[in-house]
C-alpha cells in the first residue's frame, strides 16, 4: 500500500455453499499487519464451498495489490506441505517456498529450484528423495508462474537458508550442489556462483531476463508476457536500455564470482526461443573459463522441444553423486 491515506483498510473473507449465497454475517477479518499465514476457521463438510475475499478500503490515494494465496493448512507443521517453510520479505510480503529433506545426513546438500509453475508446489521431489542425500527444494509462487527467485531481500533469504542448512549438517561449500531447470537455472547459476558451490547442474538455462523480453514479439509472440511483469520488478522502466542493463548487471556480478573450485554442467537448446544467448555468454565468461570443470551439451530445437535435455540433467546429477560423493544407484 503506497500513498494511501485511509480511515479503514482490511480483508474480509466469507464462504458460501455451492449454488447458494451464504451468510455475509458469518465472515472473518484477516489481519493485514502480519506476513504470517492465517487459518480460516472452517469445519469439514461433505459439500463444496466457495471462499470469497474482499478488500475493504476507504480513503484517497494509490492502492497496490499483490497475490493472495489460498492453501491447505498444515496445522503448524509446515507450509505448502508438511515440513515446508516460507521465506518472506517483510517489506513487500513476497515469498518463496522451501522444503528441506535431511536424507541420510551425508554429503552433499542438493539444492533445487523449481521452474515456471502455475500451481504452487515443489518440483523434483521424487528425484532428490531417490538420491538419499539431504536436499533443499525451492519454489517461487509469485506473479503468474514465478519471478526467477529475484529481489534483494529474497536473494538474501535464500542464501541464508542454504548456508544455515550447510552449517547444521556440518558441510562445507565443497559439499554443495546447485540444480535448476528453465526458470530454476537463473538462481542455480547466480547463487551457486556467489556461494562458490562444488557443482552447478542446469538444463535449459535462462540468464538474460531483459533479452527474453526484448525478443518476445518476434521469436515468441503471445507467449510468456509475464516476463514484462518480472522485469518491471528489476527496473523502473522497460526501455531497451533498461532491459539491457538487467542483463549487464547479472553478468558483471557473475564475472566477479570465484568458480575455480566449481564444476558446471550445462544442457541447452540450440534454438531456444527464450534465451538463446545463455550458453554463449556462459562459455565466454571470464569466471567460467577459470572454473574447475565446464561440461555442456546442446540439443536441437526450441526451449520445450526435447525432453532429452532434462534426461541429460538427471544423468549428470547421478553421475556426480557417484563420482564425487561415492553414492551408487
Question: Model-found features: residue ranges?
Answer:
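Short, surface-exposed "cap/lid" segments of acyl-processing enzymes
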Residues: 82-133, 137-142, 266
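Beta-strand-enriched, solvent-exposed domains that form extended recognition/catalytic surfaces
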Residues: 1-77
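Alpha/beta-hydrolase fold nucleophile elbow
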Residues: 170-182
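Patatin-like phospholipase
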Residues: 110, 121-123, 128-130, 134-149, ...
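Glycine-rich nucleophile elbow surrounding the catalytic serine of serine-hydrolase chemistry
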Residues: 180-192
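The feature captures the conserved acid-bearing segment of alpha/beta-hydrolase catalytic domains
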Residues: 220-295, 301-326
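Alpha/beta-hydrolase active-site loop
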Residues: 149-171
